[in-house]
Amino acid sequence: MPLSHGQKPTACLALADGTIFYGKGFGATGETQAELCFNTAMTGYQEIMTDPSYAGQIVTFTFPHVGNVGVNPEDDETADPVADGMVVKWDPTEPSNWRSAGELSDWLASRGRIAIGGVDTRRLTRAIRQQGAPHAALAHDPEGNFDIAAMVARARAFPGLVGKDLARDVTCAQSYRWDEMRWAWPQGYARQENARHKVVAIDYGAKRNILRCLASAGCDVTVLPASATAEEILAHDPAGVFLSNGPGDPAATGAYAVPMIREVLEKRADLPVFGICLGHQMLALALGATTVKMNHGHHGANHPVKDIETGKVEITSMNHGFAVDSQTLPAGVMETHVSLFDGSNCGIRMTDRPVFSVQYHPEASPGPQDSFYLFERFVASMDAA
């Protein structure tokens, strides 16, 4: 909750333009610098903080109640939080949920992540929207000692995400097989037994629930690092290739990912390829399009997207700060989905091959499940190959 009169702040958020927000710190102590974004999801704070796509960002939650259902080991999208920090309106209360295994503050502290509560998140969200994902410094000091001028200077010195290949920081170190399926009551996460197609997933920062959706759809998934070569991928003789989500500037990651994708497409003309988020941007770059940095990005679980081919609207989960420039799509590549918020590109496909991708997250986690059909479409394309 907001600081009471005379209460000394124990956390401070300093924006690069000199705007200062004080509040109550929780989680780890110390300071971090990152790009600020806001997320409009009402649930799923644990999944959001552990989504590798948030590397290099401090997440502002527009929903005021964060932490009230605690944390648990099943909802992590990767082993540890990846987002650099958390900003909330109300500091977390004692959790109340049958799945809770601990408190948010303790979970953040044990993983070295700083958080601030008691912030006017409506005011901050407007600032993010108007300034365009500003850089910021977030500090937590139980004694409340902050060098504001130095924090602002460090926020201004943060290099930003443009030109940053963050996929290398969050990808797996070596290949592994994935057979865990989506969570279901009462058994939890079951193991896959009857796979239909061998799929190679390129890990640019893959969320666990994307891999679970692939396994649940009947894919025998082998995950390879972001640096995998076309030769290494094709050595697995896959029925399909999946390009995962991830953080950072797609143009930077594309320095090594784009040549690999092009070589795979050249050597296996019949190979189905499916991309999500950064994987969507990697595919677009490989096909000849370009990407651009967005003003404040799309982060939330309530983003309407129109399927141009069917006219249907899907409510989707999104997390990206870069977008494909649809005006640069070459012949033979069509735009399939657009955002109803700003008209930005949300999907493409090749017109003569089973190759397609979307900017949003069909696996949700958190978010709506309107777009699960895309995993089925990927499997159907392998059935037909």
Predicted regions and their residues:
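Proline-centered loop/turn at the N-terminus of a beta-strand
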Residues: 114, 198, 270-274, 290, ...
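Active-site-proximal beta-strand elements of phosphoester/diester hydrolases
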Residues: 198-202, 316-317, 356-360
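RNA-binding accessory domains that recognize and position tRNA/RNA substrates
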Residues: 1-236, 365-367, 377-385
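Residue-level structural signal for beta-strand termini and adjacent loop
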Residues: 25-26, 64, 319, 350, ...
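Cysteine-nucleophile active-site neighborhood
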Residues: 239-326, 367-385
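Short, flexible hinge/linker loops that cap or flank conserved catalytic cores
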Residues: 191-195, 267, 349
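Catalytic beta-strand/loop cores that center a nucleophilic Ser/Cys/Thr
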Residues: 311-353
